[in-house]
Regions:
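Glycine-/small-residue-enriched transmembrane alpha-helix faces in small-molecule transporters
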Residues: 1-43, 93-94, 98, 102, ...
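Hydrophobic alpha-helical transmembrane segments of multi-pass membrane transport proteins
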Residues: 17-25, 29, 57, 86-109, ...
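Hydrophobic/aromatic residues within transmembrane alpha-helices
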Residues: 33, 42, 46, 106, ...
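C-terminal transmembrane-helix exit sites in multi-pass transporters
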Residues: 53, 57-58, 122-143, 266-285
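Hydrophobic transmembrane alpha-helices of multi-pass small-molecule transport proteins
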Residues: 137-157, 177, 208, 282-301
Length: 310
């Protein structure tokens, strides 16, 4: 791996750690916001806020790139919105929308700890989906997936009981997030990441708005009470974190990306501790395992073996 490629990989990994931190801390805002308004309303408003935030950012980046490259640019970057960008945005936006909705309904039936574990099972589903797409997965990444999965079990699962309808919904949520990661990996190689994120949330906003007017009652007072939660989830989680994911995945293997994003569960636990929830020995052990898995996924094992043989 060249120095430039290595630095890009490390920087992209850092961006995903930041995204995971934002997602983990968003659980607090999300929980408080959903005590005031419905699932569709919350998702619609945070998605619209993300669109408002991302539109000027994406326009600024697009105009700067056009000045730097010139009018002779061809391909997907020639126009602000292309057919391929719309297709990618629709696919990403649809999966993000339904994954978020299914997650919220799943939490209603299952405990928070079990919900966190089942949702982050996408780290196991991503390499499995990769097999069906005929992608080679390095053995070390499989080991990392196993370690991280065990770590999240110790970190999140504290309740006892059998499989519930909530568990089934959360497994579906994990699958949808895994699909979204693979879709991003497919399109981000040739599309601008910020614009892809913009279209993604525009689509999510439209879908959730339809559900909001069909299934829920819009209460302006309740929306006002949830304003800070909506702002935090809309700008930081949707606008910034999901965009960091899209941009970072351009330089990362999707399995490695999913492992880093699983840090979300660790930061969620730490955020809970900050707000008065104490970490148990099992949760601390789980945090340690997830960190080990992520660090191990970044180690160039092949290079170390070559050096040792020399």
């Amino acid at each position: 791996m060249s120095k430039i490629k290595k630095s890009r990989t490390l920087f992209s990994s850092f961006l995903l750690v930041v995204a995971a931190f934002i997602w983990g801390t968003t659980f607090v805002a999300q929980k408080e916001g959903l005590e005031q308004i419905g699932n569709f309303t919350f998702l619609a408003l945070r998605s619209y806020l993300a669109v408002v935030f991302l539109t000027p950012v994406s326009l600024f980046i697009y105009k700067n790139n056009k000045k730097r490259i010139g009018d002779g640019e061809h391909g997907e970057h020639k126009t602000f919105i292309s057919k391929k960008l719309i297709i990618g945005g629709v696919l990403c936006g649809t999966t993000v929308c339904f994954a978020s909705l299914v997650q919220q309904y799943g939490i209603m039936y299952s405990g928070v700890g079990k919900s966190g574990f089942l949702t982050t099972l996408y780290i196991l589903m991503v390499p499995i989906l990769g097999i069906f797409l005929k992608r080679k997965i390095k053995p070390i990444l499989w080991l990392c997936v196993v370690i991280a999965t065990v770590g999240m079990y110790f970190l999140c699962v504290t309740e006892t009981g059998g499989i519930t309808i909530g568990d089934v919904l959360l497994i579906m949520c994990a699958f949808l997030f895994a699909v979204q990661i693979m879709i991003v990996d497919h399109f981000v190689k040739t599309l601008d990441g910020v614009r892809l994120s913009l279209v993604q949330f525009a689509v999510a906003a439209v879908i959730s708005t339809v559900g909001m007017f069909i299934f829920e009652e819009v209460d302006p007072v309740a929306i006002g009470n949830a304003a800070f939660s909506i702002f935090y989830a809309g700008v930081l989680s949707s606008g910034i974190a999901f965009t960091l994911q899209v941009v970072a995945q351009k330089n990362l293997n999707p399995t490695v990306a999913s492992l880093i994003m699983s840090l979300e569960s660790v930061f969620a636990a730490l955020a809970g501790a900050f707000f008065g929830e104490r970490l148990t020995p099992n949760e601390i052990f789980g945090c340690a395992l997830v960190f080990v898995a992520i660090i191990l996924a970044q180690v160039p094992v092949e290079n170390l073996i070559k050096i040792r043989r020399k």
